[in-house]
C-alpha cells in the first residue's frame, strides 16, 4: 500500500494535472500556497532581459504579437570577429503596443483581473517575486482567456516573476509606463528591514525613470506607518507631486484598487482602514541654456 501524499506533492500534482489539461478551469488557491513575503535581496535565480528590447513580450501577450519575429544581434567576441562570425540571439516577436501599466507585487492577481475589462486597450503587467503565486496568476489568466475567448477578454493582462527592486529598468524603457500600482506592500516593520520596503529614495528614482510625465503612482496600505513612509518619500522626490484628494477620489481606478485586491478584501472583512495616496510624475526640468555660446 502506497504512502499518502504529503501536501507539497498534492500541490505539485494538482498544478501538473491542471496544465496538462490545458488550464480551462480556474485554479484553486490552496494548491499554490507560499509564504506571505519573500526577501528581495535573496538570490532567486531570476531570468531577466539585458535590455527592454530583448524582452520576449509576445509569450505573455500572444494576441498582440506581430507576425514576423525580429532577429536580435548580440555582442561578438574577438575570436568571432576574426573569423567574420556574428552571433544572433533567438528571434523575438514584437508587440503591436507596449505595456503601459505595472502592478508591482501583484499577489494573486485580483487587481489585474479587475483592470482587464476597464482598460481593454491597455497592456497591464503584474510583477510578483513568489514562484507559486506567479504560477497561480498565470493559470488564472490562461483559464479566463479560454473561458472568455469569444469576448476576447483578459488578453491584455499578464504576470511575470520578477524582482522590481533589482531589475525594473531591464523590462521597461524610459517613460514607457503611465500607471504604477503599489498595493498593500510588505510593511517590514522592523527598522533594520526598512531598506527592503518597495518605496525608497532609490526606487522612486527608478519609478520616475520608467514613468512618463503625467503618469500616476497609486499606493494603498492598511498600515499607517507605511502610508506615512510612502507619502514622505514620494513628496521628498523632485520628480513627483502628490495628487489632491479631490482628484484622487474622482479617479475610478482608485475604487477598483481599494476593493479588488485580495489583501484589500481581507482588510474590508476585518473592518480595517485603507490609506490611499497618488503621486504624479512631473516633467523633467529643462537644461539651462549655455550662456557661453
Curated annotation (Swiss-Prot):
Pfam families the record matches: Methyltransf_4 (PF02390)
Biological source species: Neurospora crassa (strain ATCC 24698 / 74-OR23-1A / CBS 708.71 / DSM 1257 / FGSC 987)
Main location: nucleus
Cell compartment(s), UniProt: Nucleus
Stretch forming the signal peptide: none
UniProt catalytic activity: guanosine(46) in tRNA + S-adenosyl-L-methionine = N(7)-methylguanosine(46) in tRNA + S-adenosyl-L-homocysteine
GO cellular component: nucleus; tRNA methyltransferase complex
Keyword terms, alphabetized: Methyltransferase, Nucleus, RNA-binding, S-adenosyl-L-methionine, Transferase, tRNA processing, tRNA-binding
GO molecular function terms listed in the Swiss-Prot or TrEMBL record: tRNA (guanine(46)-N7)-methyltransferase activity; tRNA binding
Subunit field text: Forms a complex with trm82.
Phylogenetic placement of the source organism: Eukaryota, Fungi, Dikarya, Ascomycota, Pezizomycotina
Residue positions of the active site: 186
PROSITE patterns the UniProt entry points to: SAM_MT_TRMB
Residue sites binding S-adenosyl-L-methionine per the record: 105, 128-129, 163-164, 183, 261-263
Gene that encodes it: trm8
Protein name, as recorded: tRNA (guanine-N(7)-)-methyltransferase
Family: Belongs to the class I-like SAM-binding methyltransferase superfamily. TrmB family.
GO biological process, any: tRNA methylation
Enzyme Commission numbers on file: 2.1.1.33
Pathway(s) per entry: tRNA modification; N(7)-methylguanine-tRNA biosynthesis
